[in-house]
């Protein structure tokens, strides 16, 4: 069993705030690696009953194309899903996620995006369930007029944790970014939201 450091801020702030990063317990030796997929379909259920599981998904939209993928993430243990999106010039990828861990379970939802030329990525994410959710989104707006938009809704219950980290790097000219997040915390649930827009 080791500590995995995730959701790190690009530039550290005061340690006493407790938001520089998050750590989760993870047993790499016990991790079940689920088959990697290059998403050609439009919907995908990613579910596991293993104590520790990991899955990687890649989506590529060629020049001028438009793709949409709906994912449901469920687990009874601990699940790490890495989804990598690449939008070429003039392409658009829409990723819709329902993140719903079971009772006392944990989902680490990692989204990596690359927007080339005027490529665009849209993330629509809803977080529900009875477990802990750690969400890491890292987007590179590499081309002129590249764009990213995120709309996030959440509900956390009991004493569970919702920890979100979004980092958008603006490398190209005339790039656009919009991030919206709203939701509710019930009982003793806690939330950390980090949003970084970095003009390179």
Language model features: what each stretch is:
Residues 26-200:
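Conserved beta-strand/loop scaffold segments within soluble protein domains that form the structured core
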